[in-house]
């Protein structure tokens, strides 16, 4: 049959583009519930793990860091060429400097509540005998830099204790940060800089999340939103 055709009728037909899935983000209420749960447990138990967890989760949501960036942070900047810090905290300026994708550094502000959680953690950290053997800000009881798996596991179990109905992972905190800052500020360029995106196209996906938020608010508030549905 095909040998009798002069031209293939589907030569110019393009396959439909695969829709890019939107990043999963927590609602503002869910994110605050998670952070508040961590801070509450830290205040009640005052042990190494809960105080450290509160500082980690507060910082993830406050500054939108990647997990690798978070775990690369040192307590202070080391300018030693042999042991140059990948990231560090400026405790006076309330800023964190991290080494992002492509070896690009960026500095991101830290909110007041997150700085408070970090200061509480630093006090606990400095009391560890093993603290002197590591420059890392976030360490285990043995003084070693935390592993990604440890953070992922503890965040997941904390989210369950907070009653969140979804699997929470560190990158979801970054998505939540971006979505919530964009909802509040509408400043796409600022969000791009804080996330460390080389292209603004990577940041624009959060405008879809922002539109979802607006659509939900419209459906709830507008008297004719559901007309004809």
Q: Which residues does each predicted region cover?
A:
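Conserved catalytic core of the tyrosine transesterase superfamily
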Residues: 1-229
């Amino acid at each position: 049959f095909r040998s009798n055709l002069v031209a293939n009728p589907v030569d110019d037909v393009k396959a439909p583009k695969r829709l890019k899935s939107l990043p999963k983000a927590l609602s503002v209420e869910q994110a605050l519930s998670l952070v508040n749960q961590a801070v509450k447990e830290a205040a009640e138990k005052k042990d190494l793990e809960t105080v450290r967890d509160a500082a980690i989760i507060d910082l993830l949501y406050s500054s939108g860091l990647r997990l690798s960036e978070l775990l690369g942070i040192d307590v202070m900047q080391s300018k030693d060429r042999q042991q140059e810090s990948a990231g560090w905290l400026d405790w006076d300026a309330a800023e964190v400097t991290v080494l992002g994708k492509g070896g690009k550094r960026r500095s991101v502000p830290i909110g007041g509540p997150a700085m408070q959680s970090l200061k509480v953690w630093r006090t606990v950290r400095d009391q560890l005998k093993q603290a002197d053997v590591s420059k890392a800000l976030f360490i285990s009881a043995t003084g070693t830099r935390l592993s990604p798996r440890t953070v992922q596991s503890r965040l997941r179990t904390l989210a369950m204790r907070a009653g969140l109905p979804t699997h929470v992972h560190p990158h979801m905190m970054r998505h939540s940060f971006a979505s919530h800052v964009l909802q509040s500020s509408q400043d796409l360029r600022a969000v791009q800089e804080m996330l460390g995106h080389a292209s603004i196209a990577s940041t624009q996906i959060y405008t879809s999340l922002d539109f979802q938020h607006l659509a939900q608010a419209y459906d709830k508030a507008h008297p004719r939103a559901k007309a004809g549905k």
